[in-house]
Amino acid sequence: MQNGFIKVAAAVPTVRVADCAFNVQHIENMMAQADGQGIEIICFPELSITAYTCQDLFSQQLLLDEAESSLLKLIEFSRNLNVTALVGVPIAYNSMLFNCAAVIQRGKIHGLVPKTYLPNYKEFYEKRWFTSSEALGEGAELRFCGQTVSMSKYLLFQSSHCTFGVEICEDLWAPAPPSNYLALAGADLIFNLSASNELIGKAGYLKNLILNQSARLFAGYVYAGSGYGESTQDLVYSGRAFIAENGGLLAEGERFAMKEQLISSEIDVDRLRAERRLNTSFAGAIKIERVPLMRVVDLEAYTSNVPFTLTRPIDAHPFVPEGEALDERCEEIVCMQSEALARRIEHTHAKTVVIGISGGLDSTLALLVAVHAFDRLQRDRRGIVGITMPGFGTTDRTYTNATNLMKELGVTIREISIAPAVTQHFKDLGHDINVHDLTYENSQARERTQILMDAAGQMGGFVVGTGDLSELALGWATYNGDHMSMYGVNASIPKTLVKHLVAWAARNMADEASRETLLDIVATPISPELIPADENGNIKQVTEDLVGPYELHDFFLYYTLRFGFSPQKIYYLACRAFDGTSNGTAFAKEIILKWLRVFFRRFFTQQFKRSCLPDGPKVGSCSLSPRGDWRMPSDASSEAWLADLNVDDESQI
């Protein structure tokens, strides 16, 4: 395990029906393979020692004896391995036969979990051979494979890295799966040993069932189904295998492979535990559902020398979906923003809305949202007043794009230069206009806000804010300048997503003329334009040169807000996401570390700006509203977070 990740596997071995020696040999081979890959826990299918389709042979004492002796051989084989294995085996106890999962590690059975729900309908006849775990009550102690073992459905297994529970096949399909109670009792991971036969359409249904259960429980879910070698007398077993985490699919086996399969991935236990802490309904369910008392079985510490390798992809753009989902998400977001703005317009009986249009991404998105809201309200777009306020740093490119876009969208255009007022303000302050410091920059931002506020009052409207989530996180806004408005439609939209929203609007909301303007806005460097342009009239003050790439900062922000990860873990994930092999830009580790330190320093010092934010709609999983998702003291110290990144050897992080 490293940085909260645990490596697990689902195995689909080749079997021979009722040939326990053959089956155990193949299980041993796959256990050794898993151990060599640094896999901590491996799950095999239901009744994998005997094969599932033995039918009435389960009533033969010879088969039961062979199963026990073969399992004993497997236990001995595990003595020198680090991997924990879950294998399926029939176990006779008190004149009853139970379909069990045996949890074995380093030469010992740590527990037996019997199946609870026995299907006895259509093609299933399990009650003909097996007894439900309910017959055991809270469980039993029995002699098996030369040791005394607990057999109960109320078992949790605790390693040094996670807690897991076990259910078997039909248990998942039941109205009240055992995994519900196992998760509420503390299981981070659920392992399912299965032998579910194939039917038309069943595979998709099963996948959804697994994904939904993992999401409902905020759990990892590892499913191993019987495959090639099971009897095809009446049914077909395709060898389905899945590894899921909180509704997401990490790995999936090949159906009908006609060969053995070992799928593996790393489950983020830290992430699952963070989700459960944040969701108060999870803790509430523990009381409401009267979770039964579980016995916790401690496993030996995992001490493999195999270097940990993170194989699962880490999305460099967690706020931005890929493929067809991007267009769907963009449309949904714009609809949410415009719905919120429309409601505020109606509630305030506003005659107009006023937006400062700079020719940049944020003000463009706010304008597009306003247009969408007015169209839905069936109002004349001329009720949207776009004010462009050129200043000392305004370039021809952004000015032209601002005016062209307003013309193309048919909104009311006003142009008010801030230069005269700010120049007078500098004189009043005694500030040298040639000194381009914070006073020089902030005076311009506050003058623009004053114009917008007064114009809104003049025209019976309100100011629509343009600032986005990324700027709020970094405090990249002038206090009581662009930081302030009367309704902030972009307040929970990160910068990396803003660009995609404007590009989506260019494809779906624009005519040919406005499309060209929107695409040029997307291609324009991000800048507040508070410093004069260079000698060629180009933007001199590039935001990402000053505070760092938004691609990185949005990644840092997501894992800070969404899961509360430590700086070290965020650095670890970022190095994987931005190593050039994923969907992100390649950044050197020292660059990532540099901007991560900047992020945490600014995130803490700039909270005072977020403590007095205007209203604005939440549209995604992350928000910094002081009335909703993020309540943080403005004078909190960042020392512990920065110290977490201070190590002599950065490779240790």
Residues of each region from the PLM?
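Enzyme catalytic cores with a strong preference for nitrogen-chemistry domains
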Residues: M1-V354, H372-R381, I413
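ATP/NTP-dependent adenylation/nucleotidyl-transfer catalytic domains that generate, transfer
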Residues: A18, S160, A219, Y228-S231, ...
